[in-house]
């Protein structure tokens, strides 16, 4: 049973502003309100490119729910940022022919915030909570009975004025999205009947996504240019579309054209200091730092101190792609370059 207290700390914790990386898969403010990106969202599973296994499983679950005339089981979607978790949640609501209310866990600071959302739901509707691993303890505990028994157990007041109240809720579906599955507590995680990992996209899938978006924003994108952009998009549609928009800016302003060739792609990305491997300055500094230390294993905290970056940012944002393309490896003693990574950074003759 959760307790609603008037003594909750409602202060906001300020966040330091970070330099924008075009190859960072996290969403930025501009993309949250960009109409073109919203238009690029598919309207059905048929239009959604990639994630075939997940789509197949979800279709079966949705059809089974319709057959039984029940709400879909609570669903947890996890994976790296920018892979389409929000889009999938909206498509589920479309396929279920119901409404979807969208919220972000950091905005649900007080228990009454989640209570208001739950009380506003109707039978069969969907509540989507992004970054669900960031729910505070009191808010999370309110969800336990709501998810399992479709009721709210509230304790209001204090001391002798304390009273308990149970409010029945309509049967709804909670869809949670997270980039950090391990950060979700076991009691919350166990209440999701469906759990799916959103995988990185193949180059062919990204090629199709980029081509479709280019057509949407009236760009004539040559096939080899599209392929080149797909290869450096880190398996992430959000990065692919962000890079395409920067290429469009370069083509229209510098070249006065909407026709995108491979040459324009290369020049546009070079102006943003992104090379043909999709690496930016931070990636190259990371590799150079390892190279300058004679490729001895180095601890993450030491690398972070040397580069002036947060160790968590390096671990979760920079390292995954460098490991994916085989440029670095993690060892018990620290990080070190692979032969591929050493060859790459040595050929550039760059110094940290």
Swiss-Prot record:
Entry EC no(s): 3.6.4.-
Keyword Cytoplasm: yes
InterPro entries per the UniProt record, alphabetical: AAA+_ATPase, AAA_lid_4, DNA_helicase_Holl-junc_RuvB, P-loop_NTPase, RuvB-like_N, RuvB_C, WH-like_DNA-bd_sf, WH_DNA-bd_sf
Enzyme class: hydrolase
Amino acids binding Mg(2+): 86
UniProt KW keywords: ATP-binding, Cytoplasm, DNA damage, DNA recombination, DNA repair, DNA-binding, Hydrolase, Nucleotide-binding
Plastid in keyword set: no
GO biological process, one term: DNA recombination
Entry GO MF terms: ATP binding; ATP hydrolysis activity; four-way junction DNA binding; four-way junction helicase activity
Residues binding DNA, per UniProt: 330, 335
Annotated binding of ATP, by residue: 37, 41, 82, 85-87, 148-150, 191, 201, 238
Superkingdom classification of source: Bacteria
Region (Large ATPase domain (RuvB-L)) residue spans: 13-201
Chain residue ranges for the region called Small ATPAse domain (RuvB-S): 202-273
Subcellular location(s) of the protein: Cytoplasm
Gene Ontology CC annotation, any one: Holliday junction resolvase complex
Chain positions covered by the region annotation Head domain (RuvB-H): 276-352
Summary of subunit composition and partner proteins: Homohexamer. Forms an RuvA(8)-RuvB(12)-Holliday junction (HJ) complex. HJ DNA is sandwiched between 2 RuvA tetramers; dsDNA enters through RuvA and exits via RuvB. An RuvB hexamer assembles on each DNA strand where it exits the tetramer. Each RuvB hexamer is contacted by two RuvA subunits (via domain III) on 2 adjacent RuvB subunits; this complex drives branch migration. In the full resolvosome a probable DNA-RuvA(4)-RuvB(12)-RuvC(2) complex forms which resolves the HJ.
Domain notes: Has 3 domains, the large (RuvB-L) and small ATPase (RuvB-S) domains and the C-terminal head (RuvB-H) domain. The head domain binds DNA, while the ATPase domains jointly bind ATP, ADP or are empty depending on the state of the subunit in the translocation cycle. During a single DNA translocation step the structure of each domain remains the same, but their relative positions change.
Function: The RuvA-RuvB-RuvC complex processes Holliday junction (HJ) DNA during genetic recombination and DNA repair, while the RuvA-RuvB complex plays an important role in the rescue of blocked DNA replication forks via replication fork reversal (RFR). RuvA specifically binds to HJ cruciform DNA, conferring on it an open structure. The RuvB hexamer acts as an ATP-dependent pump, pulling dsDNA into and through the RuvAB complex. RuvB forms 2 homohexamers on either side of HJ DNA bound by 1 or 2 RuvA tetramers; 4 subunits per hexamer contact DNA at a time.
Similarity comment: Belongs to the RuvB family.
Name of the protein: Holliday junction branch migration complex subunit RuvB
């Amino acid at each position: 049973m959760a307790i609603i207290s008037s003594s909750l700390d409602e202060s906001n914790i300020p966040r330091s502003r970070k330099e924008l990386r075009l190859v960072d898969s996290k969403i930025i403010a501009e993309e949250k309100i960009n109409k073109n990106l919203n238009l690029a969202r598919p309207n059905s599973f048929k239009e959604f490119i990639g994630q075939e296994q997940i789509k197949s499983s979800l279709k079966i679950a949705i059809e089974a729910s319709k057959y039984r005339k029940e709400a879909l089981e609570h669903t947890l979607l996890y994976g790296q940022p920018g892979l389409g978790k929000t889009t999938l949640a909206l498509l589920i609501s479309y396929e279920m022919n119901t409404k979807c209310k969208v919220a972000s866990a950091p905005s649900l600071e007080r228990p009454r915030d989640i209570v208001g959302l739950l009380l506003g739901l109707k039978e069969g509707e969907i509540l989507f909570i992004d970054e669900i691993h960031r729910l505070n303890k009191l808010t999370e505990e309110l969800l336990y009975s709501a998810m399992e028994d479709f009721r709210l157990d509230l304790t209001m007041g204090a001391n002798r004025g304390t009273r308990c109240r149970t409010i029945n809720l309509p049967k709804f579906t909670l869809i949670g999205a997270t980039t950090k599955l391990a950060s979700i507590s076991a009691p919350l995680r166990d209440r999701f009947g469906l759990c799916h990992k959103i995988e990185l996209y193949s180059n062919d899938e990204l090629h199709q996504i980029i081509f479709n978006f280019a057509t949407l924003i009236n760009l004539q994108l040559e096939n080899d240019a599209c392929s080149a952009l797909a290869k450096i998009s880190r398996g992430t549609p959000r990065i692919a579309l962000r890079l395409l928009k920067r290429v469009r800016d370069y083509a229209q302003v510098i070249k006065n054209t909407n026709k995108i060739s491979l040459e324009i792609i290369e020049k546009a990305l070079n102006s943003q200091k992104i090379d043909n491997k999709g690496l930016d300055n931070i990636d190259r500094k990371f590799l150079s730092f390892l190279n300058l230390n004679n490729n001895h294993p180095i601890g993450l905290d030491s690398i972070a101190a040397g580069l002036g970056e947060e160790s968590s940012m390096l671990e979760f944002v920079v390292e995954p792609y460098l490991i994916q393309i085989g440029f670095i490896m993690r060892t018990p003693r620290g990080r070190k370059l692979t032969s591929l990574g050493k060859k790459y950074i040595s050929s550039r003759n760059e110094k940290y």
